[in-house]
Design a protein with these regions (language model features):
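Multi-pass alpha-helical transporter architecture, strongest
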Residues: 119-123, 208-230
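A late C-terminal transmembrane helix in Major Facilitator Superfamily
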Residues: 159-192
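Cytoplasmic membrane-interface "Motif A"-like loop-to-helix N-cap segments
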Residues: 94-109
Length: 230
């Protein structure tokens, strides 16, 4: 007959020396400046990512005069392109750059900055320009999520502590995303005026907050350009 399916497998237990090495590697991750710098870079990238995801439709309506339908469609482009960027991030680094993450991280970090500048600094309704900006933004963010949010940290962390490295970067990233929502809300509401019974928003500070975050993400990524595994 068939072998029993409910027989539990023996769990492999680590020896005392293996446990000591594992714990040492976990602590080593927390003392690696490169991991924390990558975490900062990813956090600032997440600020720009969730700024557009959370506030992009409102921005297009209030600042540029788009309808809700058109604004939603334009922002949705970035999500689709983000999937494409994530899918091809490994091919980009392995095939085009010989496994190096720093060069594509710089290229797509600058792509993210360019996309935000096109999106935020060109006034008025320019449907195709804003659509192109969201294509660039989505591709850039999709690649950066893989590199800044994971692969670059795993590459330089001890092999038996890659999970800890991902944890540090992931926590920092979502802290950045959460702070972004609070800061963006404060800046938008704090620069609202009423003119002839109509709410008017000054997005100047929002523009520089979002673009500045993308620039800082690139800046911190450059700090770990030559970081190696310990």
């Amino acid at each position: 007959g068939f072998p029993p399916v409910n027989v539990s497998k023996e769990k492999k237990t680590m020896s005392a020396s293996e446990t000591a090495d594992f714990n040492k590697a976990q602590r080593q991750v927390l003392t690696m400046p490169a991991i924390w710098i990558l975490a900062l870079s990813s956090a600032f990238m997440y600020i720009s990512r969730y700024a557009v995801n959370s506030w992009g439709v409102f921005y297009l309506e209030a600042q540029k005069g788009y309808s809700t339908l058109d604004a939603s469609f334009i922002i949705s482009i970035s999500s689709v392109c983000g999937i494409i960027g994530t899918m091809f991030s490994g091919v980009i680094s392995d095939k085009l750059f010989g496994g190096r993450r720093n060069v594509p991280a710089l290229i797509f970090g600058l792509t993210n900055v360019l996309a935000l500048c096109l999106f935020l600094l060109v006034p008025g309704v320019h449907f195709w320009l804003d659509a192109v900006a969201m294509i660039l933004f989505g591709l850039g963010i999709g690649v950066l999520i893989c590199f800044l949010g994971g692969l670059m940290a795993v590459d330089i962390a001890p092999r038996n502590a890659s999970g800890a490295a991902l944890g540090v970067v992931g926590i920092a990233s979502y802290i950045g995303a959460g702070l972004q929502d609070v800061m963006s809300g404060v800046l938008i509401e704090g620069h609202k005026t009423i003119r002839n019974g109509v709410e008017v928003y000054d997005f100047t500070y929002i523009n520089w907050f979002w673009i500045g975050s993308a620039i800082l993400s690139v800046f911190f990524a450059l700090w770990v350009w030559n970081a190696k595994q310990k």
